Amino acid sequence: MFDIKRKTIEWGGKTLVLETGRIARQADGAVLATMGETVVLATAVFAKSQKPGQDFFPLTVNYQEKTFAAGKIPGGFFKREGRPSEKETLVSRLIDRPIRPLFVKGFKNEVQVVVTVLQHDLENDPDILGMVAASAALCLSGAPFMGPIGAARVGWVDGAYVLNPTLDEMKESKMDLVVAGTADAVMMVESEIQELSEEIVLGGVNFAHQQMQAVIDAIIDLAEHAAKEPFAFEPEDTDAIKAKMKDLVGADIAAAYKIQKKQDRYEAVGAAKKKAIAALGLSDENPTGYDPLKLGAIFKELEADVVRRGILDTGLRIDGRDVKTVRPILGEVGILPRTHGSALFTRGETQAIVVATLGTGDDEQFIDALEGTYKESFLLHYNFPPYSVGETGRMGSPGRREIGHGKLAWRALRPMLPTKEDFPYTIRLVSEITESNGSSSMATVCGSSLAMMDAGVPLVRPVSGIAMGLILEQDGFAVLSDILGDEDHLGDMDFKVAGTSEGLTSLQMDIKIAGITPAIMEQALAQAKEGRAHILGEMNKAMDAPRADVGDFAPKIETINIPTDKIREVIGSGGKVIREIVATTGAKVDINDDGVVKVSASDGAKIKAAIDWIKSITDEAEVGKIYDGKVVKVVDFGAFVNFFGAKDGLVHVSQISNERVAKPSDVLKEGQMVKVKLLGFDDRGKTKLSMKVVDQETGEDLSKKEAAAEEA
């Protein structure tokens, strides 16, 4: 019934199995991939014809984690998987980025890749396995895909590279580096790094590329036995049309790209495009003309040629800079004084308002992942409204790009955050991109660093970021610092680097062509280091160290530790005690299972009142010490006094006064404030108090005074 083909290899100390022919046989390509006991199914399907009017490549990648893969049932009312989680969105992008450039130029048929996690062993992360399986499925599908790609995760543990570390090993790693590439070249890098050098990171990229070769060979071997016939697709030869268009508007495009202001340049480019389509496009007046959509694609090629040759031939870029110069930078802090921390970061025509908000443990984000549930106390949200590029457009929930850019900035900043013990706040950063002309994610990194310092977050060191680009031709190449949006779109590489004065914290690279050598990457990292240092210097002019304390409008938080066996007493039956503490003092109290108590409020007096109350419950009263107390009940043999938080003790009638007291009610009333000394505890553990040895006016210990008089 099944024609099963299987390829098994040992990879990084684990067994990788790629299988096809048993599941999802109606898909163009389907691969069941297993590593350890993690199982992923990847399918690839493509349309056999192009939709009329299609002028872009409609590739969709959907990565989905089924909760049954970890033996769980979804939370929520409906008990089924809903909208993609942040991780699913990020892994979908991770798979998309290295495979998109490998489809044959001009192919615009719809392609959908679906990667489904069927089983998770809680050791081997399914993201790398999903990338490998997606690559294999595309190679089997017959689509015009110039793969395969391989992928690998690299850690840095105890000074050594670790291939595809387990989730437990990643906790000890100083680097989380994901690399994808073909047999000949690296195509994509994504990482989070704890201030390592450029040499170590680049070494990790090369190590990953070497180690993924075995996977690439395995996919090729599987495809030789199971791939479908290649889809017949021949890119159309448009050289003749391109030559006509160049003669017609080549000079106009060159003139347009000498205009430094973005909006004016776009108007000039748009006018040249309109002129080309009017002259060469199909119309009633020109029945032998060409499809306007085809002309638009050719016009874009001409744009790229003009920009690229201009940079390589003259060393000057669209806005007149040389390849290493960073655009003018201005950093400002405290621009929104009632927020907890704020910054405006402007670099050329790219600008971000970043606001930091500090919260308590109640504000942490609860995340239900396959690996288990946890709370995240550092949040970064990136928003890219259409007005930032002078356009109208959709507003609403964030798209994949916004989620991806926000996560990149999050990874760059997280290694520099203080520990929870040193700074027990939840931190939320919101980056509003108000202008964009390239590298808005790196503007978010810089603005976020300033906003957190303005909020009093004790960062280990400030973080700056820069986006690099590349123009690569047969006769030479140029590495570009601080790229514009056009240089990103028309160039060969988008290379984002973030870090401190001591090392890198994040690196993201997307390469659109083959042929990027380690030497080129090394030059790009070295040039980026210079750019980062310059940007950091400009940021330091606005603020070079965190404020000494959080702002007036931020909540104040103090942390204390209590014995774990006292937690129940602080909470009380059904939460009665802790609710009373919160209601009476106005402070928020958060108690962890390990006895760490976080108390927060808008002012310090409320925090002190709550902490004193908690300590009165958890601390032991000290024999011989004098306390303020309140009479809570008067009886024939004395009075019960509340003197230490929730603790009550008995003042026996003989201990009320040095004079004889016949009836305690003649001397004491309920609610009366008194001063008492703790004498000790009786055989049953009951507390014994005394009023007569304490001066009720001054609180002086009279017994010590009498003892001193006797000695004299």
From Swiss-Prot:
It holds the Pfam family RNase_PH. It comes from the Bacteria. It catalyses: RNA(n+1) + phosphate = RNA(n) + a ribonucleoside 5'-diphosphate. Gene3D superfamilies: GHMP Kinase, N-terminal domain, K Homology domain, type 1, Nucleic acid-binding proteins. It is found in: Cytoplasm. This is Polyribonucleotide nucleotidyltransferase. Its EC number is 2.7.7.8. One of its GO terms (molecular function) is RNA binding. GO terms for cellular component: cytosol. SMART domains: KH, S1. InterPro entries: ExoRNase_PH_dom1, ExoRNase_PH_dom2, ExoRNase_PH_dom2_sf, KH_dom, KH_dom_type_1, KH_dom_type_1_sf, NA-bd_OB-fold, PNPase. It comes from Caulobacter vibrioides (strain ATCC 19089 / CIP 103742 / CB 15) (Caulobacter crescentus). Keywords: Cytoplasm, Magnesium, Metal-binding, Nucleotidyltransferase, RNA-binding, Transferase. Its cofactor is Mg(2+). Residues 555-614 form the KH domain.
